């Protein structure tokens, strides 16, 4: 089965069609966007944290470099109510960092910082 099928017990017909025809593609797990102008802020590969240390990120890193965006690998853990409780984050581009364990509030601060940095030149910045 496909990864999509693993989560939803249904197939992903487009992904399956691509594989059957040797057409290669990936899905980028996350593309953070500006809340005002919708420009991209970052790319991320995300994965439920089962203690693994690796996920394929080569294409996401290449796209991020081409777009001049930071990119991240994010492993996340959830509690029994499926609320994110911790994340292991590695910055992939422009400079690779060591993996860092962060709480959701810490990751939110990083994402908020990316929005703040973008706001300096945002074409639709909301003034407060």
Task: List where the protein language model places each region.
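Conserved catalytic cores of phosphodiester-cleaving nucleases, focusing on short active-site segments
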Residues: 30-49
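Nucleic-acid nuclease catalytic cores
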Residues: 66-91
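Soluble or luminal CAZymes and related metallo-dependent hydrolases
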Residues: 9, 52-55, 102, 109
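Acidic-basic catalytic patches of nuclease active cores, encompassing PD-(D/E)XK
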Residues: 1-26, 114-128
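Helix-rich interaction surfaces within compact, conserved domain-sized segments
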Residues: 59, 87-128
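Short, surface-exposed beta-strand/loop "edge" segments at domain boundaries and coil↔beta transitions
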Residues: 52-54, 82, 96-99
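Active-site-adjacent loop/helix micro-motif of nuclease/hydrolase catalytic cores
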Residues: 23, 49-59
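Basic/aromatic recognition patch in beta-strand/loop cores that engages polyanionic ligands
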Residues: 56-63, 67-68
């Amino acid at each position: 089965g496909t990864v999509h099928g693993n989560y939803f017990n249904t197939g992903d017909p487009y992904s399956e069609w691509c594989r059957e025809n040797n057409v290669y593609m990936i899905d980028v797990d996350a593309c953070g966007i500006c809340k005002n102008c919708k420009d991209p802020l970052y790319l991320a590969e995300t994965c439920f944290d089962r203690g693994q240390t690796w996920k394929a990120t080569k294409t996401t890193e290449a796209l991020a470099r081409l777009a001049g965006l930071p990119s991240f690998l994010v492993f996340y853990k959830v509690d029994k109510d499926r609320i994110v409780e911790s994340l292991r984050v590695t910055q992939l581009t422009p400079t690779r960092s060591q993996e860092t364990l962060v709480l959701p509030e810490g990751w939110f601060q990083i994402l908020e910082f990316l929005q703040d940095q973008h706001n300096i030149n945002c074409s639709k910045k909301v003034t407060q």
